[in-house]
């Protein structure tokens, strides 16, 4: 290369004497940015391509630009430095700076940074790195010999020619050393490659450095070629400037490199520059010196350059970056270039000589140019005047165009506003239309309900009318039957006297009572015929009195006295029991004699009265309940007609059994038992099972109604005495047996549930803690409840017949269950759970673990009788136990519905479900991924498929997952995982492929990466502010702040670090005050503290001094609508309202009912606390209690995650197994809280 260029001092360079480049060079396109100007790809009109740096010459920069030209002119004549060809001045109109064109050698293969980016794995081979590093050191040795520091060595300032030659460029920050001092103290360069002594110049004005700072940058560039980027490149540049002087020297991360390479890096990166080897010493290093295959390396580099250009070729020629110190540009695509060859391009030396000759001619002609300029000044002034006019007109046109654009933009803005207004109006109309349709639908449903109610009322009236007619017909029949029986009685007495007048009656002690006779009932010896006639007459009259009193049945069903019926009879007649009474008693006691006995017809006064069966306090059946009112009315009419009332009704009971058969009752066998009505004054609160009650009612009806068919058959054959006696019982027995069969057939076809059915099953539905084992049911994981969530029963605690409308709180488990609700004495709603089969009431195991105590506002209680329940649930510190709030044992587990006509949609009701899957180890965290749930345990990561059958897919095993969050928009899962509690980021596409196995390319890639080198992470929080996603991390004794960097980085990069904190952080969050100031809020065992991100100052927000020992912080809740200034901090069993400066904002302390294990902020401005005895829901604004879910036994629960109205939490049972609970908070309920 030419070395004959005379060295000139700075004063010898006269910028005004440079020629205009017009006709010599022309610009083609921009290829990069330098420190003082843009770099163009240019073309010499007669020879080849050149690099042209175009700079505006201002008075402030004239000295620096002159210095750069001087450096290039003197020291660019080296094979490893881009050659300086010449400089030109392009004149500009008055008022504008002239342009300096700096023409240099064009390196067509781009920079080392481009080479690394275009290489697989973003790493170069070790022999390539050795070759490039040697060429860099040779160029630096040339500069250092001449006492010049480059000061900006980095990958982008090391270029390659098409022949794989290495050239140093960009002398924009180079400086010549003062020959006496030998050191510089100017702070300039690129941060990541900057030497520690250069950075120290900014902090200490007395600090100095020398040419060995370039050797540090050379070592960093070698690491860049080996690892794809310089150390600390994932940090903010100002953060890197802070860490480089303080961190130990960087080293190669991978172990694959040779010892010579490690040694070379170690030699370059010595922090004390006085001990750093010189350039000549590094050139003699074995890594640089021993390169036996240099020619082969150059061939490989050239072939790689050609392959990359062909692979990415989109244009005709290649363009590369010429980058400055402060700006890093994106990768520029490469294009087709000239054919590659090891031989130098012909004409290169001729071009250099031509530029030197042109430069010399410029100097000789400078004087002539000055004279010519003086002559042309007049012309220039005229031209300037003309140009000024043109510029004024042009400026005017530009202003007009701007005004037109402004008006057009204003018009477009108004049109957009009009469109938005129209869209808002359209949406408003659509919403009004939707509300109107919903109102119409609601009215239609109300109208249908009203019509159904009216139809039901009409049907009931028709049934009552039918029953009334039946009763009247039966009454008429009974009157006829009474007359026939009186006639028959007279005939029988007449016929009976004649045989007795002829026979001698035997003694009563020898009479065999065990042999019944239907032909001749033998009289007692001391009775005269008149007495016997009275006995028969009284027996018949007693049965008739019973038959004609239908209204007395209601009293017999509800009177608590078991001796009422017998007392009623004896008050009428002191005589022994009649024949019909005897028959009734023997039937009641379920006598198994196949034929009716004669004893009741011929018993003496000395006979012992058989034991009476006490009248059972039987509960009213559904049919009888519905027909109670009309019957009482009918009973009043009959009593006005002169009939006696009696409590032992026979024929009416048979009639009611017939009515029950004729009118099918829509009640279930399992739940349609009866309990005593609270309106009956003497009703007993105890109750029996429903099936048993109906059985007793039927058996009573059989026994007590049996005389009626016997009397009917007797009336048909009054002339035949023997047939009369023979037909009395068998006919009734056959009739009642058939009637019982029909009733049982009707019961079997009843629908399963009806809101008018009653059940009081204290014996069957009692639950204990021992019975709370989970009953697994296939497919019950995502089961939904049926539309009927309530059943009907009476409540002794509702006075004056008042009823309340409640919304049932559903607690789902592994089996479908039916909740029931009773208002307690304190006014608090207690939800319990009962189960019923479709036909029989069975003893079951309760699988519910929760007893909700809900604020009446939550359940939307609307009492039907005009009363309002206003009591709010209270909660004591020691917790309420379910046993303490139950009713008396006879009411335990009752099914209660206090608003039978109101059925609410399922979406309004809060639910708790438990997934069937049992995890072998404790669940530590979870996150929703779409609709499915990622579950992290002590032993791995799994996916719970909530969209299907609840299947669990294992994803990662033998790794502990402590915390996780899904960021679907970024395709990452952020976790704290592993034995060392590292912050790992998993790619969702990789996890998805582990389930689907449909992308082989994804399987080959690494599925996760770590955030920095952080270990021992305690807690983190992802905070989204506008479009920035911050990741604030609590370590054992420090807090780190990272920020997400989009493509091409696509990772979290370090933003701030706060180490050696006085209090070890346990909980961390980040707030943005008024959209301007970032503050880290963290909780420790001493209280809550804040860190100002900008200044790094740490101060206390709240220290609970009333607690002597250490505390456990639960949650930091940034209150909405406070510009990030106000907080609710929860610890132990309390919560305090403070602002970010430590001032108490509310004189309110949120007090949990017990010590919670987890506290979480949920939607609708509420917070939930999970304790061992209950789950509490409280308002985040006031701390008031909104609802409580009591546990039936103490258990440890942990909040996992939530979205909208869904909350997930887990339970840990003995042995370490866990299950996931899924809680849906009803939308309407939440909005009304």
Curated annotation (Swiss-Prot):
Region named Mediates interaction with RAP2A: 852-1206
Expression sites by tissue: Appears to be ubiquitous, expressed in all tissue types examined. Highest levels observed in heart and brain.
EC number(s) given by UniProt: 2.7.11.1
Biased composition (Polar residues): 544-559, 783-803
Compositionally skewed regions (Basic and acidic residues) per UniProt: 521-537, 654-663, 713-726, 741-756
Gene Ontology MF terms: ATP binding; protein serine kinase activity; protein serine/threonine kinase activity
GO terms, biological process: positive regulation of ARF protein signal transduction; positive regulation of focal adhesion assembly; positive regulation of focal adhesion disassembly; positive regulation of JNK cascade; positive regulation of keratinocyte migration; protein phosphorylation; regulation of JNK cascade
The keyword Kinase is assigned to this record: yes
Record field: compositional bias (Acidic residues): 316-337, 766-781
Intracellular or extracellular location(s): Cytoplasm
Biased composition (Low complexity): 666-692
Modified residues (N-acetylalanine): 2
Record: residues binding ATP: 31-39, 53
Signal peptide, first to last residue: none
GO-annotated cellular components: cytoplasm; focal adhesion
Chain positions with Phosphothreonine modification: 822
Region (Disordered): 305-348, 401-463, 489-805
Chain ranges of the CNH domain: 920-1207
Cofactors named for this entry: Mg(2+)
Chief place where the protein resides: cytoplasm
Record note on quaternary structure: Interacts with the SH3 domain of the adapter proteins Nck. Interacts (via its CNH regulatory domain) with ATL1 (via the N-terminal region). Interacts with RAP2A (GTP-bound form preferentially).
Function, as annotated: Serine/threonine kinase that plays a role in the response to environmental stress and cytokines such as TNF-alpha. Appears to act upstream of the JUN N-terminal pathway. Activator of the Hippo signaling pathway which plays a pivotal role in organ size control and tumor suppression by restricting proliferation and promoting apoptosis. MAP4Ks act in parallel to and are partially redundant with STK3/MST2 and STK4/MST2 in the phosphorylation and activation of LATS1/2, and establish MAP4Ks as components of the expanded Hippo pathway.
Family: Belongs to the protein kinase superfamily. STE Ser/Thr protein kinase family. STE20 subfamily.
PANTHER family named among the record's database cross-references: MISSHAPEN LIKE KINASE 1
Protein name: Mitogen-activated protein kinase kinase kinase kinase 4
Natural source organism: Mus musculus (Mouse)
Gene: Map4k4
């Amino acid at each position: 290369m030419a070395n004959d260029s005379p060295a000139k001092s700075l004063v010898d360079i006269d910028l005004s004497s440079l020629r205009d480049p017009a006709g010599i060079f022309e610009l083609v396109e921009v290829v990069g940015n330098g420190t003082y100007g843009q770099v163009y790809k240019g073309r010499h009109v007669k020879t080849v391509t050149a690099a042209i740096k175009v700079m505006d010459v201002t008075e402030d920069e004239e000295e620096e630009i002159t210095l750069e030209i001087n450096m290039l002119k003197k020291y660019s004549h080296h094979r490893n430095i881009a050659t300086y060809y010449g400089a030109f001045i392009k004149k500009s109109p008055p008022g504008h700076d002239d342009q300096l064109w700096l023409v240099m050698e064009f390196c067509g293969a781009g920079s080392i940074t481009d080479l690394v980016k275009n290489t697989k794995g973003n790493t170069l081979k070790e022999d390539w790195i050795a070759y490039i590093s040697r060429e860099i050191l040779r160029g630096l040795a040339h500069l250092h010999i001449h006492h010049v520091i480059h000061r900006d060595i980095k990958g982008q300032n090391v270029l390659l020619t098409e022949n794989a030659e290495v050239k140093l460029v960009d002398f924009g920050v180079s400086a010549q050393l003062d020959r006496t001092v030998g050191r510089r103290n100017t702070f300039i360069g690129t941060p990541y490659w900057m030497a520690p002594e250069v950075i120290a110049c900014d902090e200490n004005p007395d600090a100095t450095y020398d040419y060995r700072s370039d050797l540090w940058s050379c070592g960093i560039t070698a690491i860049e070629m080996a690892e794809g980027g310089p150390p600390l490149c994932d940090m903010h540049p100002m953060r890197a400037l802070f860490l480089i002087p303080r961190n130990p020297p960087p080293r190669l991360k991978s172990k694959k490199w040779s010892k010579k390479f490690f040694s070379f890096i170690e030699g370059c990166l010595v922090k004390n520059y006085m001990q750093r080897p010189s350039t000549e010493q590094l050139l003699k290093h074995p890594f640089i010196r021993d390169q036996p295959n240099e020619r082969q390396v150059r061939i490989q580099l050239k072939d790689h350059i050609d392959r990359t250009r062909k692979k990415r070729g989109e244009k005709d020629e290649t363009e590369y970056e010429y980058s400055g110190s402060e700006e890093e540009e994106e990768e520029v695509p490469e294009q087709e270039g000239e054919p590659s060859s090891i031989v130098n391009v012909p004409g290169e030396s001729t071009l250099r000589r031509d530029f030197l000759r042109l430069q010399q001619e410029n100097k000789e002609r400078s004087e002539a140019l000055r004279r010519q300029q003086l002559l042309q000044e007049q012309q220039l002034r005229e031209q300037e005047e003309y140009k000024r006019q043109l510029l004024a007109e042009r400026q005017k046109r530009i202003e007009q165009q701007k005004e037109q654009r402004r008006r057009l933009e204003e018009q477009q803005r108004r049109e957009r506003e009009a469109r938005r207004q129209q869209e808002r109006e359209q949406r408003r109309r659509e919403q009004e239309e939707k509300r109107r349709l919903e109102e119409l639908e609601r009215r239609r449903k109300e109208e249908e309900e009203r019509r159904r109610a009216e139809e039901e009322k009409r049907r009931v009236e028709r049934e009552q009318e039918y029953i009334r007619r039946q009763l009247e017909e039966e009454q008429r029949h009974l009157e006829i039957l009474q007359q026939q029986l009186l006639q028959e009685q007279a005939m029988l007495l007449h016929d009976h006297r004649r045989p007795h007048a002829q026979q001698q009656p035997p003694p009563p002690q020898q009479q065999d009572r065990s042999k019944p006779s239907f032909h001749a009932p033998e009289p007692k010896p001391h009775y005269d015929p008149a007495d016997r006639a009275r006995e028969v007459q009284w027996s018949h009259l007693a049965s008739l009195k019973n038959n004609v009193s239908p209204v007395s049945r209601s009293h017999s069903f509800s009177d608590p006295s078991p001796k009422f019926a017998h007392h009623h009879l004896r008050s009428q007649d002191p005589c022994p029991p009649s024949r019909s009474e005897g028959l009734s008693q023997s039937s009641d006691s379920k006598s198994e004699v196949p034929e009716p006995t004669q004893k009741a017809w011929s018993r003496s006064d000395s006979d012992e009265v058989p034991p009476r069966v006490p009248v059972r306090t039987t509960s009213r059946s559904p049919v009888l309940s519905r027909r109670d009112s009309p019957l009482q009315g009918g009973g009043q009419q009959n009593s006005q007609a002169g009939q006696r009332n009696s409590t032992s009704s026979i024929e009416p009971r048979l009639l009611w059994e017939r009515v029950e058969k004729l009118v099918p009752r829509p009640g279930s066998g399992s739940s349609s038992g009866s309990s005593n009505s609270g309106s009956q004054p003497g009703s007993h609160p105890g109750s029996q099972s429903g099936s048993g009650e109906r059985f007793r009612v039927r058996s009573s009806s059989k026994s007590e109604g049996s005389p009626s068919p016997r009397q009917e058959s007797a009336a048909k054959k009054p002339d035949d005495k023997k047939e009369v006696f023979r037909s009395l019982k068998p006919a009734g027995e056959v009739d009642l047996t058939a009637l019982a069969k029909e009733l049982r057939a009707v019961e079997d076809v009843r629908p399963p549930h009806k809101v008018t059915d009653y059940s009081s099953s204290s014996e069957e539905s009692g639950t204990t803690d021992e019975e709370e084992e989970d009953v697994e049911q296939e497919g019950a994981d995502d089961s939904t409840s049926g539309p009927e969530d309530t059943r009907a029963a009476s409540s002794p605690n509702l006075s004056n017949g008042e009823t309340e409308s409640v919304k049932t709180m559903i607690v789902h488990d592994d089996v479908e269950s039916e909740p029931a609700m009773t208002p307690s004495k304190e006014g608090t709603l207690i939800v319990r759970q009962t189960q019923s089969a479709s036909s029989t009431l069975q003893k079951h195991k309760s699988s519910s673990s929760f007893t909700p105590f809900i604020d009446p506002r939550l359940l939307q209680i609307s009492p039907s009788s005009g009363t309002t329940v206003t009591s709010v649930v209270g909660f004591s510190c020691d917790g309420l136990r379910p046993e303490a709030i139950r009713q008396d044992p006879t009411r335990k587990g009752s099914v209660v519905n206090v608003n039978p006509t109101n059925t609410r949609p399922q979406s309004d009701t809060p639910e708790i479900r438990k997934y069937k899957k049992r995890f072998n180890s404790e669940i530590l965290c979870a996150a929703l991924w779409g609709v499915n749930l990622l579950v992290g345990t002590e032993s791995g990561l799994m996916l719970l498929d909530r969209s299907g059958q609840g299947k669990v897919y294992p994803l990662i095993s033998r790794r502990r997952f402590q915390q996780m969050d899904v960021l679907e928009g970024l395709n990452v899962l952020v976790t704290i995982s592993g034995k060392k509690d590292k912050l790992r980021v998993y790619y969702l596409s990789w996890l998805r492929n582990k389930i689907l196995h449909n992308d082989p390319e994804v399987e080959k890639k690494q599925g996760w990466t770590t955030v920095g080198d952080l270990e021992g992470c305690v807690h983190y929080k992802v905070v989204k502010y506008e479009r920035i996603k911050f990741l604030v991390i609590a370590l054992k004794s420090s807090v780190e702040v990272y920020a997400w960097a989009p493509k091409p980085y696509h990772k979290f990069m370090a933003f701030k670090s706060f180490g050696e904190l006085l209090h070890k952080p346990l909980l961390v969050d980040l707030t943005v005050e008024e959209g301007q100031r970032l503050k880290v809020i963290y909780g420790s065992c001493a209280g809550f503290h804040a860190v100002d991100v900008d200044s790094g100052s740490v101060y206390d927000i709240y220290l609970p001094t009333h607690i002597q020992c250490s505390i456990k912080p639960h949650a930091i809740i940034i209150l909405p609508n406070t510009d990030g200034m106000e907080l609710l901090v929860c610890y132990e069993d309390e919560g305090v309202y403070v602002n970010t400066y430590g001032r108490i904002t509310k004189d309110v302390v949120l007090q949990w009912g017990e010590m919670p294990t987890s506290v979480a902020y949920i939607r609708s401005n509420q917070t939930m606390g999970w304790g061992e005895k209950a789950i509490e829901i409280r308002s985040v604004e006031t701390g008031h209690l909104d609802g409580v879910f009591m546990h039936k036994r103490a258990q440890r629960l942990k909040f996992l995650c939530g979205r909208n109205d869904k909350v997930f939490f887990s339970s840990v049972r003995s042995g370490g197994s866990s299950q996931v609970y899924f809680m849906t908070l009803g939308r309407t309920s939440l909005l009304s809280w």
